[in-house]
Structure formats: structure tokens, C-alpha cells
Amino acid sequence: MSPTYDVIVIGLGGMGSAAAHHLSARGARVLGLEKFGPVHNRGSSHGGSRITRQSYFEDPAYVPLLLRAYELYEELERATGRNVATLCGGVMAGPPDSRTVSGSLRSATEWDLAHEMLDAKEIRRRFPTLAPDDDEVALFEAKAGLLRPENMVAAHLQLATRQGAELRFEEPVLRWEPYRDGVRVHTGENTYTAGQLVICPGAWAPQLLADIGVPITVERQIMYWFQPKGGTGPFVPERHPVYIWEDADGVQVYGFPAIDGPEKGAKVAFFRKGQHTTPETIDRTVHAHEVRAMADHMSALIPDLPGTFLKAATCMYSNTPDEHFVIARHPAHPESVTVACGFSGHGFKFVPVVGEILADLALTGATAHPIGLFDPARLTAPAARGVQP
């Protein structure tokens, strides 16, 4: 039997690495367990870039968490010297009544966030790479930008190690169980015990957290990189924003400036347009018809973007039915287990503040952060299951 720890963290991707950092920063004896190597590309915390924004169309309830996350981006950069965030500005575009535009405006208004509303003519003037229809508008947020996911995970792992956390990679968790006054975790190599367990399973949530009763579906997501027709000059962060663009049919795409030099292009992707999958069966091959569909869609929005196709990569979303997160004490084991899952394709920008929340819950049983929206009871109550009382 290995030594007992204060807290074991299962999963060292975005959320788990942040939890390991915040827990160890508070003096806890932490063991982190990861199925793959550090900063791997098999889950949901890779791909070179993620959008961050405060005018949050999903729900205004997320905004206070984002304000704290932005503070933690800066702290992380100061503590590690790694580039984590580049706030190059962001455009949330589409028809005025689209969720992307109207929801972003709602959050910006409710929380008094700095923003500008642009009509199609002004969008084209400010950002010549973009070609909106005359009836489209955009909310521009100067504080939006991009995150470097691999850098953020590496920074949190670096700090956790510096603070004394023991991190074990290539050691998949087979199962866990309540044990005495805490938990016991079994891997293929050892059995570990701790007073508290934090589970950040990503796309492995259906296996590791089946007993919380939340139906989480895993979705295959594709990221594409194109070399623009005239080169990357007009697409550098100083000239081209991050964007989320919704069409009249509700299809959303999101994309980034060219951030990796003149030869590596710019990244774009559809948002939630993938097939259901599992971590074991996901198709990691990106097919020619998928590349064509992406290029065809973007040719109307950003005509110069789909010049030469460079590469593509897959990742996985873990979606809840309402697309809101699950962050809570485990319903069946509230005294010793904390869970974080179902980030539904929009969670990475919250990584540092989720780590802070998970440390609060594991060490004190509560958090001052507003997380009522993320209670799994909303999805497991009789009404959520379609059962009449």
C-alpha cells in the first residue's frame, strides 16, 4: 500500500492540472494520476489555441468566474514565465437575434463589460479579412483573445511539482471506492489512499463517473489549419481577431489569427457539429470530405482563409444535456469526493478558476465562487429525466 495523501487528483489535463496546483499551493499532500504523458494530445486540452471571452453568450452566470479566471491568467504567467493568454480582441458575429450575438450582448450589458456593437459595414472596415452579410452584426470585445492550452497545462503542472505534488503519468486509474474515512484508488501499478478525491476525467467521465447519474456524451471535434490565400500577413493577431460566427441556421464556427508564424496558417473549426464517440473508438483520421465542408463554409465568411489546407487534428467534447458544467461534491460521496466534468466544449477558459474551486471543495467542502448552475442535481432530478412527480 502506498502512502496516504491528503488529496488524489484523477486526470491531469486542464482542470486536473489546475486543481493539483491550487491544492498543493495550500499545503495539501497531493497525488496526481494521469492515463497519458504530461501535456498530451489524446483528450480535450490541446490544439494550440482556445478562445477566451467575458461577454459570455452561454449564460451571464459565467461572467464572475471569467473575471477571476482573467486574474489567474496573469498570476500564472508571472509565476512561470509562460505565455498563457493573448488578448487580441474578439468578434461575436451573426444575425442580430442569434444566440452568439444576443447572448453576448446580454452578458455584456448585465455585467457592464466594455464592448462595441458593429454593423456589417463597420466589421468590414475594422477587419478586412471578414466578409459579413449586410444584415449581420457583431459584438466586439477588446478583452477577448486566445489561450495557449498546452502552456497552461504545463504551467500548472510546473507549479504543482514545485509545490511538492507527486504527479504520476502513464498510470491509468482502473477504479476508485470509498475507504475508511476517505477513498482508495486502484491503478494497474498500485493502490493509493487519500482523505479526498478530485475527479477530472474529461472524455472518460462516462466510465469513471457513471454513478453520478448525469448523461454525458462524448463528441468528436475537428480543428483545421489553412494557409490563407495571400499569406498570413492580414491574419496576424494585430489585424485579425478571434471570432465566433453563427449563421442563419444556427451553425457556429470559431477561429483564430495566425499565431505560429507565416508557414503554419490559421485555425478554424465548427462548434458542436461532430459525431458521438468514445475515447476508445474515436476516428482520429480527418477525411477529405470534412476538409471540403470546412473550406466551403469559410469561403463565404472569410474568403481568403481557406487557401491551402495544412493539417487537422481531433479532440473530444464531453457534453451535458444542457451544455452547462458539472462541478460539485459527488452526490453519493459528498464527504470525500469532488467531481468536475461535462465542460461541453467551452470550459478551457475557466481552467484556473475551476482549479481554485476544486481546491475549495476538496479542502473545505464549499466555495465562495458561484457554482449553483453546475449542480448535477439539475440533470438527475425527476423532472430532468422526464419523470412526473
Swiss-Prot record:
Query: How is its cofactor bound, per UniProt?
Result: Binds 1 FAD per subunit.
Gene Ontology molecular function: any one: flavin adenine dinucleotide binding
Reported cofactor(s) = FAD
**Annotated keywords:** Cytoplasm, FAD, Flavoprotein, Oxidoreductase
Q: Does the keyword ATP-binding apply?
A: no
Check the record and name the InterPro entries matching this protein.
Answer: 3-OH-isobutyrate_DH-rel_CS, FAD-dep_OxRdtase, FAD/NAD-bd_sf, MTOX, SoxA_mon
Which residues are annotated as modified residue S-8alpha-FAD cysteine in the UniProt record?
C315
Q: What reaction is this protein's catalytic activity?
A: sarcosine + O2 + H2O = formaldehyde + glycine + H2O2
E.C. number(s) listed in UniProt: 1.5.3.1
**Any idea what job this protein has?**
Catalyzes the oxidative demethylation of sarcosine.
Sequence similarity: Belongs to the MSOX/MTOX family. MSOX subfamily.
Its quaternary structure?
Monomer.
Q: What is this protein called?
A: Monomeric sarcosine oxidase
Protein's organism: Streptomyces sp. (strain KB210-8SY)
Q: What are the top taxonomic ranks of the organism? A: Bacteria, Bacillati, Actinomycetota, Actinomycetes, Kitasatosporales
